[in-house]
Regions:
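Intrinsically disordered or low-complexity boundary/linker segments at protein termini
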Residues: 1-94, 105-109, 114-185
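Repeated scaffold domains used in trafficking and secretory/extracellular systems
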Residues: 96-99
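PAPS-dependent sulfotransferase catalytic core
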Residues: 102
Length: 185
């Protein structure tokens, strides 16, 4: 079953991970957050996952997002995860994701918050994500996360496809990229 089918068939949080080193040796968790991610129903859940992970590992969690999303992240972290060492940096445009290449070292974990097609934080630039990650972050530990969505899978109607037709081949591209990467390594 390809990733697209898996994502379309569930409203649950899905993480795709590639670790190049033991998790307990990570020094930093860098999280790239798309605009409007704060409006997704699973927002608080994934923030909690990575703040807890940072606390347990004793490493800093560094969020990169636009100004509005960063404000919401700061409020949430201050309220629920004040003991977690965090940093917040502005990532003006999601297309600037490549600017993170200078921020992510070999002993860092890069987390890319993605979205299912049709959700409020979905961006067409997600279509280029597999190629970008493969080209610029191939030597980094990586997690791509698709946050929780409300409703049962068959009840979800997206903005881009209100009739619920087969969504796209983009999830399949991510799956093929991971398959090729795993096969290569």
């Amino acid at each position: 079953m390809c990733i697209r089918d898996r994502l379309k068939g569930t409203h649950r949080e899905v993480m795709i991970a590639k670790f190049l080193m033991p998790v307990n040796t990570l020094r930093r968790i860098n999280i790239a957050v798309p605009p409007k991610a704060e409006y997704e129903s699973g927002f608080s859940k994934w923030v909690e996952h990575f703040c807890r992970m940072g606390s347990i590992l004793g490493c800093r969690v560094h969020f990169f997002a636009n100004e509005r999303t960063l404000m919401r992240l700061q409020q949430l972290v201050k309220k629920r995860h004040a003991g977690t060492p965090t940093e917040f940096s502005i990532l003006e445009e999601w297309e600037d994701l490549l600017l993170l290449t200078g921020q992510v070292n070999y002993d860092h974990l890069l987390v890319v918050v993605s979205a299912r097609r049709g959700s409020i934080s979905y961006d067409t630039s997600f279509e280029r994500l597999p190629a970008q990650l493969g080209k610029y972050f191939s030597n980094n530990s990586l997690i791509i996360i698709y946050p929780d969505q409300f409703g049962e899978p068959q009840e979800i109607v997206s903005f881009s496809d209100p009739r619920g037709h087969n969504e796209s081949q983009h999830y399949e591209k991510v799956g093929k990229w991971f398959y090729k990467w795993l096969k290569k390594n």
